[in-house]
Amino acid sequence: MVKYKELVAEFKNLKNSKGSLLGGVDPEHAARMKLQNRFSTGVDIAKYTSDIMHADMGAYDQDPSNYTQSLGCWHGFSAQQMVMAVKKYQKTTSKSYVYLSGWMVAGLRSEFGPLPDQSMHEKTAVPNLINEIYTFLKQADARELQHLFLSLDEAREKGTNEDEIIQQIDNFETHVVPIIADIDAGFGNEEATYLLAKKMIEAGACCIQIENQVSDAKQCGHQAGKVTVPHEDFLSKINAIRYAYLELGVENGLIVARTDSLGAGLTQKVPVSKEPGDIASRYNDFLETKEIEDLSELTQYDIAIQQNGKLVKPVRLENGLYTFREGTGFDRVILDCITSLESGADLLWIETERPNVKQIADMVKEIRKVHPQAKLVYNNSPSFNWTLAFREQVFNEWSESGKDISEYPDPKKEPKGLMDEKFDKSELSKEADKLIQRFQKDAANQAGIFHHLITLPTYHDTALGTHVLAEGYFGDKGMLAYVKEIQRKEIRRDLASVKHQDLAGSTVGDEHKEYFSGDNALLAGGKGSTMDRF
């Protein structure tokens, strides 16, 4: 980042060289506006943030405690508040990203209204949200820098030392952080994937996540009916994304290859194998088949293939989809991941049915036999009942070790019994909560997870917060519900949102008006503004 005084000097030289053309321009004001708009394009952002991610991956390889995190955000404002909070409480945005969830785009950002996570939303909603998020993050930069500029002006008026403030400006840490953006299954064929990836990169995405499901039959990873595609189809889309990065000059752009094979039991195609042991034959080896001992067993339009020297008929459903053998999910995941890493993916995503460190670690161990530096992005999904999952885990561990568990309901007999609020302060629940608190650290250390994300936290946070407010406001508390539960807490936490006019850009706008109009500027933040009360 260019130094403040150097940039002011550059604009002074520019003004001198242009004569009357820049006669009304104050070089220092121009320098300030330039600093407030550090990133001119989304591609600039993608280049900058991709370098950050690669550096973070290198740090993780040296020490797995250096894992990274993100929260899924469905609006630019939620992303802005997340990054501002990280910067406020952690004193840095280092190792903190934004996640863009296809589920939340479908559920909250489609012009069709709320949709399930089945790639039914308009594909342009994805790059539009990326652009919106970075617009809000850049606005957070502009606001914070503006307050530093005002402090600098005040120091000059008082005749105090301005060096410390200029140093803060020069060392300003941007709110622009990497985005991991969900492209679902690519929204069509490989050309469609390439075109959408370009739009996402142009909006600022440095990391694109793609899954190995059939695009037109895509399902949420935590629902039934998932259909995977042969490796050749999936790898062509990884290749398409890589070409999009290279075309736009983002050489360090990242691809997360997600496999849903652990929970997917169906495939749409039987790929063509050209020689024994190739990737198609290995994929087909997982098919559920029935040996044909006599050709009379085949009916009209049945399909039969030769497999390991035998004639077999792949088991096919009424809808024409083929089934995999039960119990093959683990091995299919391993093959998916190894193949993806060998074909251009930077990171892996294994969608699991529960948050279990050992289960994830067992798969990563197999992958690392071939690719020792393999790293995962992991979905700490709200689709998991975390409370129940970890209480059951502790219950089972205690049961196996012979510990007395007689005071707790057996999950096999009472599936949701351990969720009862009466167990919240029990020793079992305390132990489960410790495991939940340690989950990300343990998984990073033991299971190769470089990045932990929560897909839908701001969806649930909005739902809960609105319910709590509405319950009190429309109930007996009236206005106190808002004042006590929101405004008073904002004030005492010293949140920027308390002064919502300033956060929305009023202060920046007033300063710009003064740059443009001088003493004739009509300002919004002068006397009479209620924001002075905060």
Regions found by a protein language model. Give the residues of each.
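Substrate-binding cleft of secreted/luminal carbohydrate-active enzymes
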Residues: Q437-E471, K477-K513
